[in-house]
Every structure is written in structure tokens, then in C-alpha cells.
């Protein structure tokens, strides 16, 4: 069987590649269509093909949308896939328009994402535009794209979950989608974004002589992201006796005595850096979208033997980790709890061992991957 994975993003994309690897292990041939850059490569896909997505196409502006639709139609005629695995809402909608056998991978919960994107667009800085007229034009443009995204993505998502098998990353999202569709969804399958078992065969974590925390994420440095806001985090460590902080993904120009940044790391180097720490943080300031987010960094932390601390409204993560994590309300609360662990290192080490063993038994991709093959059978 031929399976074509479509995305409005490029490679590497570990969620897309894990899904493809699942099918490939079962003897199927997998292909990729999406944005390609100079670093686009994969040993998983038989072929990778360029699809020129634009912002207009992604939000359904007819001229741009139909240009991408023609590209996908041409690619489908060339490859003749048995199944389309759509990793973005635009390609899922186009697959539906073309009458193709498709699965919709709604791992972003696109109706929610459209509203978050609208918030972020409204925060864009237009101070560098040359004139007031330029600012007006820019504001009109982003306002139009924002409205299109919210309207189309919300409507498309409802159409898709009523008509095609849908994969998502948490029970919270699945339940919300069922409620949106009044319980009339086709089939909604939960496949959490856990690491592959083959990449997490780590030894039992070792005790550390000092307290150190890590945050993995290149987001939120050069632009405001309303639901991943970590502003003030580095100052929190600089101003308090709560150990050191490493941020994986940020460039290291601002490193100091209590804080360092690693820049981008490959996955193996990322895990090697994580292991040097004791606590994995998800320190996003509270946001209405958080109950529906299920970031995979929490589970990477767990496999690296890090005790996970996260904002209390990230309920999907807290539910998955059960009692193997600790939530906080704000940065003052986070600082207080880090101070406690600085003075109670034996307790912290015990918690690290506990979450490490919990992860080895429960938090790996292969435990759920058969659900993807089951979704294909529903088409």
C-alpha cells in the first residue's frame, strides 16, 4: 500500500516521520509532500516532493488555495497513493474536495490554533513600517488573514471530523472535537506524541550535586507567542537562588553565570544535554488554550530522567504524567518550589527515578502506533 503524507510544513518533522515509520515497518511504501528547504531529507520516505504552500493557501483564500490544490492533484496522479495522511487542515480539506481516501491528523487542534494565531498576529510589531499608510495596509492584511483562518479552519475542522477518521494527541482534544460535532464524528483516535522506543534507551539517571533545570524550545525568543510565553524566565533564575537554567534551542549570545543557551541541537544531542539536568520545565504563562496542548517535550524530559514541572493549566500533560510531575501557578510559585528542591536533593532524585521508570513503561510511541494503522482501515 502507498501512503502519501501531506503537510504545509517541511522536514524534519518528527511527528510526521514517526507516523510514516509506523506504516513502513508494516511493509507499506511512504511518500512526503510539503514545503522543502535545503535541509529537507529523510531516510524514511521513498520520495519527497515540493508543495508550495503560502499563507493565503493555508487559510483558504481561493486563488492561492486552488494553486496548491492543483499541485496536490498532480502529485496524486503521479504517485497514485492508496491513502492520504494529512498533517495540516489545508491538505485534509483539499483531499476531501478531491474525494481522496484520507486520514486527518489534527495534532494541532486547528480550530484552537487559528484563534491563537490571530492573537499572535495582533501582537506583530509594525513600528518599522515607513509610513502610517503602510501600517494601515499591514493591519488590514493581517486582520483579513486572521479572520479567514478562524472562519475557514473552524468550519473545515467540523466538516472533516464528521467525514474522515481523525487522529489527535490527547483525550482533551478528542472530547472537545466530539462536543463540537454533537457526538456525530466519524472516528477520533488518540495517538500521543511520545518518543520512539528506539531513541530513549537511556541508563538510569544519576544524582547531581547541584540543582539545574532545562527548557527545550526555540520558540518565544524573537517573537511573542501568546500561549508559550516565557518572558522573565531567565531573570527569574538570575535573581533567585534556584540553581541554573539551560535553554535548548536559543542561541547562546545571552548566556550568563546562571543561564546558558545551546542553540539548535539534533535529537541525540538534545537528549545528551537534558541528561545533565535534574528538572524539565514547561514554564509557559497561563493561557486559555493550554488545556488542549500536549507538548512532547514533557515526555522527552521524563525519558531523560528529569522531574517535570509545568504550569497548572497544562492539564493534558499533568493527566498523562499522573503524580510524576509538579504544577505551579506562576513564576513566584515556580521559584518557591525550585528553592525547596535545592534544599531537598534526595527527594528530587527519588522523583526523577520514579518518572524515569514510569516513562519506560508507558510513554513511548510504539505503545500507540497500531492505532494509526487502525485509522487507515476505517477509510
Language-model regions, residue ranges each:
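Donor nucleotide-sugar binding/catalytic pocket of nucleotide-sugar-dependent glycosyltransferases
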Residues: 138-201
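Conserved catalytic-core segment of nucleotide-activated headgroup transferases in glycan assembly
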Residues: 16-17, 21, 194-257, 263-271
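A short, charged, and often flexible helix/loop element on the N-terminal side
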Residues: 46-73, 136-145, 261
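Nucleotide-sugar-dependent
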Residues: 14, 221-227, 268, 272-273, ...
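A charged, aromatic-enriched C-terminal amphipathic alpha-helix characteristic of glycosyltransferases
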Residues: 329, 343-377
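Membrane-proximal helix-turn-helix segments that form the acceptor-binding/catalytic region
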Residues: 70-74, 93, 104, 110-112, ...
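N-terminal subdomain of nucleotide-sugar transferases
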Residues: 1-40, 231-241
Amino acid at each position: 500500500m502507498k501512503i502519501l503524507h501531506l503537510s504545509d510544513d517541511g522536514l524534519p518533522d518528527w511527528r510526521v516521520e514517526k507516523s510514516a515509520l509506523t506504516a513502513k515497518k508494516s511493509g507499506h511504501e511512504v511518500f512526503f509532500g510539503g514545503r522543502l528547504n535545503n535541509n529537507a531529507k529523510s531516510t524514511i520516505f521513498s520520495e519527497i516532493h515540493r508543495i508550495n504552500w503560502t499563507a493565503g493557501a493555508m487559510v483558504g483564500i481561493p486563488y492561492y488555495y486552488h494553486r496548491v490544490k492543483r499541485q496536490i492533484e498532480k502529485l496524486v496522479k503521479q504517485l497514485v497513493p492508496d491513502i492520504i495522511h494529512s498533517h495540516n487542515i489545508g491538505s485534509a480539506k483539499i483531499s476531501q474536495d478531491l474525494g481522496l481516501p484520507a486520514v486527518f491528523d489534527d495534532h494541532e487542534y486547528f480550530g484552537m490554533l487559528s484563534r491563537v494565531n490571530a492573537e499572535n498576529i495582533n501582537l506583530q510589531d509594525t513600528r518599522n513600517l515607513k509610513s502610517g499608510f503602510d501600517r494601515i495596509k499591514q493591519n488590514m492584511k493581517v486582520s483579513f488573514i486572521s479572520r479567514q483562518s478562524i472562519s475557514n479552519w473552524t468550519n473545515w475542522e467540523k466538516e472533516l471530523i464528521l467525514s474522515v477518521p481523525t487522529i489527535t494527541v490527547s483525550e482533551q482534544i478528542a472530547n472537545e472535537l466530539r462536543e463540537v460535532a454533537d457526538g456525530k464524528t466519524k472516528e477520533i483516535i488518540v495517538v500521543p506524541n511520545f518518543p520512539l522506543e528506539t531513541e530513549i534507551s537511556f541508563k538510569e539517571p544519576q544524582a547531581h550535586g547541584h540543582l539545574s533545570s532545562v527548557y527545550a524550545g526555540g520558540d518565544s525568543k524573537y517573537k511573542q507567542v501568546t500561549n508559550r510565553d516565557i518572558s522573565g524566565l531567565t531573570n527569574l533564575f538570575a535573581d533567585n537562588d534556584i540553581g541554573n537554567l539551560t535553554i535548548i534551542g536559543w542561541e547562546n549570545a545571552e548566556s550568563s553565570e546562571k543561564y546558558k543557551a545551546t542553540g539548535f541541537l539534533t535529537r541525540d544531542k538534545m537528549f545528551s544535554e537534558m541528561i545533565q539536568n535534574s528538572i524539565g520545565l514547561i514554564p509557559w504563562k497561563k493561557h486559555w488554550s493550554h488545556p488542549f496542548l500536549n507538548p512532547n517535550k514533557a515526555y522527552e524530559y521524563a525519558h531523560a530522567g528529569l522531574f517535570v514541572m509545568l504550569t497548572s493549566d497544562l492539564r493534558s500533560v499533568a493527566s498523562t504524567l499522573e503524580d510524576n510531575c509538579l504544577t505551579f501557578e506562576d513564576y513566584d510559585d515556580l521559584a518557591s518550589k525550585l528553592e525547596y528542591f535545592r534544599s531537598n536533593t534526595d527527594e528530587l532524585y527519588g522523583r526523577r527515578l520514579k518518572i524515569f521508570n514510569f516513562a519506560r513503561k508507558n510513554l513511548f510511541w510504539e505503545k500507540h502506533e497500531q492505532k494509526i494503522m487502525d485509522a487507515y482501515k476505517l477509510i
